[in-house]
Amino acid sequence: MAALSIHHFRQAKQAGQPLVALTAADYATAQILDQAGIDLILVGDSLAMTHLGYTSTLPLTLEQMLHHAQAVRRGVERAFLVADLPFLTYQVHKEQALLSAGRLMKEAGVNGVKLEGGYPDMVETVAFLVQRGIPVLGHIGLTPQAKHQLGGYRQQGKTTPEAERLRQEALSLEQAGAFALVLEHMPAELAAQISAQVGIPTLGIGAGPACDGQILVTHDLLGLSERLPPFAKAYTNLRQAIREAVEAFADDVRQKVFPPR
């Protein structure tokens, strides 16, 4: 099966075909998602919380991201693979962003990178990367790396000035060359307006049904997270299933029925 290219995303938007994106941070999960036909797999900095036990995405380093992205790459044949640039690996200056993104593409084999924010300096950075051959997935609305400045994981764009700022950020990121945008935790009406205004696809996460596609953290979808964000949906409860399987194994061992005699 042919690997998806950057052109797939604009073509999907033009055809009205919803895009599906999920996160992965290990080989097995990546392989399963890829075989299920997911369009985009994101090695998200959320792995700092889901896989490494941190309370936010901020502690994640570029070396840790490289380690996980390399594992994911080995499991992906078809999906378009994007990795987050961790906090403070791209905000200092655009040359820093180029070095970080370049390492992820060169050493981990990702197809593109995701950057948070749409303020002027970040738009300039996006353009700088795109001009040098690096596909960029933009991310506006709730940007978790800025949680302290935002006052927590709060919905963004609820006021008229905030909504207008996000609309302008979306247009600016499109003009800078981003191939798609993540719209996170914003009013559905605003996300619908942005999705209609830009020519590139939008991937919603807590942004209503009018986006061109949806993205979720796979741990949330599988019921592995201890707490679900208000906009997520668990399609199964693997946390409970895993615990029950482990307890059943432990019981068999303690009762000396496994392995069978």
UniProtKB/Swiss-Prot annotation:
It comes from the Bacteria. PANTHER family: 3-METHYL-2-OXOBUTANOATE HYDROXYMETHYLTRANSFERASE (PTHR20881:SF0). The active site is at residue 184. Pathway: Cofactor biosynthesis; (R)-pantothenate biosynthesis; (R)-pantoate from 3-methyl-2-oxobutanoate: step 1/2. Its cofactor is Mg(2+). Catalyzes the reversible reaction in which hydroxymethyl group from 5,10-methylenetetrahydrofolate is transferred onto alpha-ketoisovalerate to form ketopantoate. Keywords: Cytoplasm, Magnesium, Metal-binding, Pantothenate biosynthesis, Transferase. One of its GO terms (molecular function) is 3-methyl-2-oxobutanoate hydroxymethyltransferase activity. This is 3-methyl-2-oxobutanoate hydroxymethyltransferase. GO terms for biological process: pantothenate biosynthetic process. Belongs to the PanB family. GO terms for cellular component: cytoplasm. It is found in: Cytoplasm. Its main location: cytoplasm. 3-methyl-2-oxobutanoate binds at residues 45-46, 84, 114. Its EC number is 2.1.2.11. The lineage of its organism: Bacteria, Bacillati, Cyanobacteriota, Cyanophyceae, Synechococcales. Binds 1 Mg(2+) ion per subunit. It holds the Pfam family Pantoate_transf. It catalyses: 3-methyl-2-oxobutanoate + (6R)-5,10-methylene-5,6,7,8-tetrahydrofolate + H2O = 2-dehydropantoate + (6S)-5,6,7,8-tetrahydrofolate. It comes from Synechococcus sp. (strain JA-2-3B'a(2-13)) (Cyanobacteria bacterium Yellowstone B-Prime).
